[in-house]
């Protein structure tokens, strides 16, 4: 390397930052653009304001290196694909670049979107780039250079952030005989080398490459590949200083390999997996070690005393130790400031995004100026830790005793074949029964009624009356369409986790704790802070009302224990398995009550089963064991004649196929539309013998599938699953779609089922 732009290190930073806006401004702007209510210039203005405000806030808080290029209209993997020219041919017909971008993200009537799956073990979803033999990489640096220019004009100490080449290719999908995308690595490295020079020419002093794939077992060659890549990038003649960020786990052998390259800084996650043994890596001498010591994924306040002790063991192991969050704060809400309903004790235990930035700055100051410089902050932290440990709300002896008793007596149901016979005699369903996953469109009338209730413009009785009308409308629509098994549509539910959290002991639901799940989809994860209990039934009134309107079976709809954990901010003071069992006990009681009320089918959704799977294979069996046990605890209290359904969505199912079978649900519905039914062969390989409903169309896209298209998917599914075990359903709930889209799609789905059923 001939010339480095700068060698001056930084001391306090974050790995990345959210982009939806503190009041979900980006969600409203993008959805307005999609609906043609907002112009492109208006959308870009909102985006620019959000970026500038975020950079300004981070710099003002005391960070001396601020990440840029973390903003995205939809997803950072899609942004990277655009930057690298890795676009499928099917969008070439779209002339406008932004419309091309959203076509790949969401699809339209002519273009299928990219497949979507979970970002490692988080609840964020990314779009999977497609790499085929015809893919020709070409650099399109307009976005990253434009945002760097904006930030530098604002005098922000800017550090562009880019998904690294190893992670980008390992997370991409080879299509049309293209082989594994990682085989194109050498070709892609040349593009990144060119980008480094451009960033240096445009004023970047540091650049961050995100390589979270290095904490996984995605490829045994990853450590060697990463070392080769960053040796090449570090040798670029004129470039910014390079910081490679690993997060979500322990980089293992990749750490020493990276340290042997010419790069200047390496980030390690000390919250999820890594420990202070990295201090024993001699190759770190001369590097900046960016210590991810403040949890970027959960909302608990950092124990500053403990964090400083960990940091102390790192001093001397590297030329410089900088303090950072463990990962991007994309995964936590913006700030505690809007949460006016928090009691003082609970508030003192928490740190959202803004508070985590403050913790980073405090810890960096302690390293620079000594502990006495932050004595007040350490005292406040110690008081919060003591308050949380002693709070009586954290423990419920009765709940723990009941779990022990039920587990001791067994959580297995009867033989699956005998259950099927009993359920068939009760339900009298046709072959290829049609159903939906649960939720129906959240119409403007539903949202207005919920807002009116929150603002005290209507009372609870009026709200219930309006929601019952929505239930009646959903039942009527399903009967008109000819569906075989109905749902009540969930109009009363704001979210499939928050709805239950608001009724369970041990949870707190935030007012404004929004985080991005994918695109414009935002969720408000509740805070699970203590032992979980169910004070009263949660769904009986709604499901029994819906069942009273029809002779067809209506499914009871519940969220499973693993998903409730995955989509909440969960206590970190006891094993996840213990907390899962507490949630499972509450769900078990609800299933028993539903059965007693005459409900014949109960669905316990576990869309997040894959999400919590540890990234290293050595740790996965233990997780899958307790996850399956929790589901069985939740579902084994009902009779054999009661049919248990479950639903799993956007995941790489291969790694959890055995666990899906072990759940022993009578009917399992899964996402399969974007992945072209590939999961069915995996299920057959593990001897899956229960009924299955592979999603026959993608609800995350506005396009309406044709009858022939759905029939083709069903015929493909029948090659793997016999007709007597195959169900017909969309791949997920319909909450985010319009009534017109839903009606047209379901009409075609029912027609396709009848066509295939008749042998046409």
From Swiss-Prot:
Q: Where does Zn(2+) bind?
A: 647, 649, 671, 732
Q: List the disulfide bonds.
A: none
Offer one example of a GO biological process linked to this entry: methionine biosynthetic process
- In which residues is 5-methyltetrahydropteroyltri-L-glutamate bound? 24-27, 118, 521-522, 567, 611
**Reaction(s) catalysed (UniProt annotation):** 5-methyltetrahydropteroyltri-L-glutamate + L-homocysteine = tetrahydropteroyltri-L-glutamate + L-methionine
Q: Which Enzyme Commission numbers does its entry carry? A: 2.1.1.14
Q: Which protein, by its recorded name, is this? A: 5-methyltetrahydropteroyltriglutamate--homocysteine methyltransferase
Q: Which organism is it from?
A: Mycobacterium leprae (strain TN)
């Amino acid at each position: 390397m001939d010339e480095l732009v700068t060698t001056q290190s930084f001391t306090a930073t974050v790995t990345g930052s959210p982009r939806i806006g503190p009041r979900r401004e980006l969600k409203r702007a993008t959805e307005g653009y999609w609906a043609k209510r907002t112009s492109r210039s208006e959308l870009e203005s909102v985006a620019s304001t959000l970026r500038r405000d975020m950079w300004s806030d981070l710099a003002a808080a005391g960070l001396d290196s601020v990440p840029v290029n973390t903003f995205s209209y939809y997803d950072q993997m899609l942004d990277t694909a655009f930057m690298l020219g890795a676009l499928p041919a099917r969008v070439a017909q779209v002339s406008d670049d932004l419309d091309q971008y959203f076509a790949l993200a969401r699809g339209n009537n002519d273009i299928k979107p990219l497949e979507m799956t979970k970002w490692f073990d988080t609840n964020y979803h990314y779009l999977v780039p497609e790499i085929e033999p015809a893919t020709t990489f070409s650099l399109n640096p307009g976005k990253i250079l434009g945002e760097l220019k904006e930030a530098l004009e604002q005098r922000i100490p800017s550090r562009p952030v880019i998904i690294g080449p190893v992670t980008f290719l390992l997370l991409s999908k080879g299509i049309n005989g293209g082989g594994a995308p990682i085989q194109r690595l050498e070709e892609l490295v040349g593009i990144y080398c060119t980008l480094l020079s451009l960033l240096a020419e445009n004023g970047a002093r540091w650049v961050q490459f995100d390589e979270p794939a290095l904490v996984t077992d995605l490829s045994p060659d990853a450590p060697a590949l990463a070392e080769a890549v960053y040796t090449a990038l570090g040798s670029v003649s004129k470039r910014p200083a390079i910081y490679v960020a690993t997060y979500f786990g322990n980089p293992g052998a990749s750490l020493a390999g990276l340290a042997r390259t010419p790069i200047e800084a390496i980030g390690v996650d000390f919250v999820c997996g890594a420990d202070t043994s990295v201090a024993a890596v001699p190759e770190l001498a001369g590097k900046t070690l960016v210590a991810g010591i403040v949890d970027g994924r959960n909302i608990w306040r950092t124990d500053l005393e403990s964090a400083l002790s960990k940091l102390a063991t790192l001093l001397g192991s590297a030329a410089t130790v900088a303090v950072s969050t463990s990962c991007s704060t994309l995964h936590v809400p913006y700030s505690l400031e809007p949460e006016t309903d928090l009691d003082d004790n609970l508030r003192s235990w928490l740190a959202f995004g803004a508070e985590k930035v403050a913790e980073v700055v405090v810890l960096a100051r302690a390293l620079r100026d000594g502990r006495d410089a932050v004595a007040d902050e350490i005292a406040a932290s110690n008081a919060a830790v003591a308050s949380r440990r002693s709070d009586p709300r954290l423990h419920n002896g009765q709940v723990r005793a009941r779990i022990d008793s039920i587990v001791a007596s067994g959580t297995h149901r009867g033989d699956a074949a005998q259950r099927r016979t009993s359920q068939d005699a009760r339900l009298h369903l046709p072959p290829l029964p049609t159903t939906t996953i649960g939720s129906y469109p959240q119409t403007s009338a539903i949202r207005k009624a919920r807002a009116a209730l929150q603002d005290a413009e209507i009372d609870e009785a009026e709200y219930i009356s309006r929601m019952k009308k929505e239930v009646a409308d959903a039942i009527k629509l399903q009967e008109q369409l000819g569906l075989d098994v109905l749902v009540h549509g969930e109009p009363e539910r704001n979210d499939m986790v928050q709805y239950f959290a608001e009724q369970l002991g041990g949870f707190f639901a935030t007012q404004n704790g929004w985080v991005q799940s994918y695109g414009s989809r935002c969720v408000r994860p509740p805070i699970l802070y203590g032992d979980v209990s169910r004070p009263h039934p949660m769904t009986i009134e709604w499901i029994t009302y819906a069942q009273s309107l029809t002779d067809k079976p209506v499914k009871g709809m519940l969220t499973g224990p693993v998903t409730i954990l995955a989509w909440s901010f969960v206590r970190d003071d006891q094993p996840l398995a213990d907390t899962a069992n507490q949630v499972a006990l509450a769900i078990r009681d609800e299933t028993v009550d539903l059965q007693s009320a005459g409900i014949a089918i109960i669905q316990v959704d576990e869309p997040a089963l894959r999400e919590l799977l540890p990234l290293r294979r050595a740790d996965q069996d233990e997780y899958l064991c307790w996850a399956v046990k929790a589901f069985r605890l939740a579902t084994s209290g009902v009779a054999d004649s009661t049919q248990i359904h479950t639903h799993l969505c956007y995941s790489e199912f291969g790694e959890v196929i055995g666990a899906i079978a072990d759940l022993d649900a009578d009917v399992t519905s899964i996402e399969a539309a974007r992945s072209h039914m590939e999961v069915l062969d995996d299920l057959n390989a593990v001897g899956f013998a229960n009924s299955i409903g592979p999603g026959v169309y993608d609800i995350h896209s506005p396009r309406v599938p044709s009858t022939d298209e759905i029939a083709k998917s069903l015929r493909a599914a029948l090659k793997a699953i016999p007709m007597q075990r195959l169900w017909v359903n969309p791949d997920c709930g319909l909450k985010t779609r319009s009534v017109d889209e839903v009606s047209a799609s379901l009409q075609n789905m029912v027609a396709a089922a009848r066509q295939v059923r008749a042998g046409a």
